[in-house]
């Protein structure tokens, strides 16, 4: 009889865990169906909304691809592809990314490698239809993705702040980009990353279950602030859209999913 009670207890526990798992997984929203760009809009600096200049953004092999096959030069053609079906405020974002191939030389210097393995995800982005024609970056917070060349340290999941300001350890970050504490990823392997975003209060960047960057008090201001938001300097940035960046190096994105938090 005792064994039967123990068995029943274990069975109930396993059923509970199973239900919890199902309930949790059902809260995740997939932003990319692996087949199309339904729900996404793109904006490339110098071009109108949804003008996919030189077919920069494509779908293939179940991924969103940023490609530069048709480019001879990267002439500040900063691009972003936005999930515009929904704004997000408090959320947990997960995605995988992978750099591949060679970057496109910048028009400033054929040997300028600043955009080598350089991309990112923009959090709390403005809507792309608000962006000016030549605007390089949406007002947002960037989780910057960088990759190494096999030589020097180059952490990923850094924080950049186009049109925004943040505090790190209670002090305003004075640099536009601040390095995380992550390791350098030199290969072209897939990298799984996470972001925990709590409105304007705090954001955490996570890789391999390790929090490598945290910042708080997200607000409008700083460099790259669009003239559309000048009157908002100092105001909290509480919510926005999610966008992926094209900055001169081929990259793929997949498994892009969000769970909204209370």
Give the ranges of each region predicted by the language model.
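Carbohydrate-interacting regions of secretory-pathway proteins
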Residues: 19-262
């Amino acid at each position: 009889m005792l064994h039967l009670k123990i068995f029943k207890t274990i069975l109930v526990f396993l059923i509970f865990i199973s239900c919890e798992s199902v309930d949790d997984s059902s809260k995740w929203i997939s932003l990319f169906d692996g087949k199309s760009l339904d729900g996404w809009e793109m904006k490339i600096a110098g071009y109108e909304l949804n003008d996919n200049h030189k077919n920069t953004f494509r779908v293939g092999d179940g991924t969103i691809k940023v490609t530069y096959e048709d480019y001879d030069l990267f002439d500040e053609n900063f691009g972003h592809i936005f999930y515009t079906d929904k704004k997000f405020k408090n959320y947990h974002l997960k995605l995988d990314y992978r750099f591949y191939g060679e970057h496109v030389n910048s028009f400033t210097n054929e040997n300028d490698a600043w955009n080598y393995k350089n991309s990112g995800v923009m959090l709390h982005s403005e809507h792309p239809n608000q962006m000016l024609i030549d605007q390089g970056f949406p007002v947002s917070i960037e989780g910057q993705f960088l990759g190494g060349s096999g030589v020097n340290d180059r952490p990923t999941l850094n924080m950049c702040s186009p049109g925004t300001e943040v505090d790190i350890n209670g002090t305003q970050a004075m640099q536009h980009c601040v390095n995380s504490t992550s390791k350098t990823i030199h290969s072209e392997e897939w990298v799984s990353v996470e972001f925990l975003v709590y409105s304007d209060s705090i954001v955490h960047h996570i890789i391999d279950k390790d929090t490598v960057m945290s910042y708080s008090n997200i607000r409008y201001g700083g460099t790259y602030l669009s003239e559309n938001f000048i009157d908002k300097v100092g105001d909290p940035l509480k919510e926005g859209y999610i966008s992926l960046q094209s900055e001169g190096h081929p990259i793929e994105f997949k498994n892009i999913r969000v769970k909204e938090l209370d």
